[in-house]
Amino acid sequence: MLVLSRKLNQSIQIGDDIEVKIISIEGDQVKIGIEAPKHIDIHRKEVYLSIQEENNRAASLSVDLLSQLSSQKK
């Protein structure tokens, strides 16, 4: 993991298209702004993990449903 220090209003550039900027620092909370192309999904980590879990659950249900439907046709 690359660890960088930034101060208020400083940025980090990721590739050509993504900029992460420190917007404010209040106590132990840091607000960041992210500029990125619209086709790039940006989520908080806990939201991303929840989405992945839900997708895995849905995919599993789909496989089970397809198996059930397939066995009913036979």
Swiss-Prot record:
Q: What biological process terms from GO does the record include? A: bacterial-type flagellum organization; mRNA catabolic process; negative regulation of translational initiation; regulation of bacterial-type flagellum assembly; regulation of carbohydrate metabolic process
**What keywords would UniProt list here?**
Bacterial flagellum biogenesis, Cytoplasm, Repressor, RNA-binding, Translation regulation
InterPro entries linked: CsrA, CsrA_sf
Domain of life the protein comes from: Bacteria
- Entry's Gene Ontology cellular component terms: cytosol
The protein's name is Translational regulator CsrA
Q: Where in the cell is it found?
A: Cytoplasm
Q: What does this protein do?
A: A translational regulator that binds mRNA to regulate translation initiation and/or mRNA stability. Usually binds in the 5'-UTR at or near the Shine-Dalgarno sequence preventing ribosome-binding, thus repressing translation. Its main target seems to be the major flagellin gene, while its function is anatagonized by FliW.
Query: What NCBIfam families does the record tag this protein with?
Result: csrA, PRK01712.1
User: One Pfam family from the UniProt entry?
Assistant: CsrA
Location, primary (coarse class): cytoplasm
Q: Which GO terms describe its molecular function?
A: mRNA 5'-UTR binding
What family, per the record? Belongs to the CsrA/RsmA family.
Question: What quaternary structure, including any partners, is listed in this protein's UniProt entry?
Answer: Homodimer; the beta-strands of each monomer intercalate to form a hydrophobic core, while the alpha-helices form wings that extend away from the core.
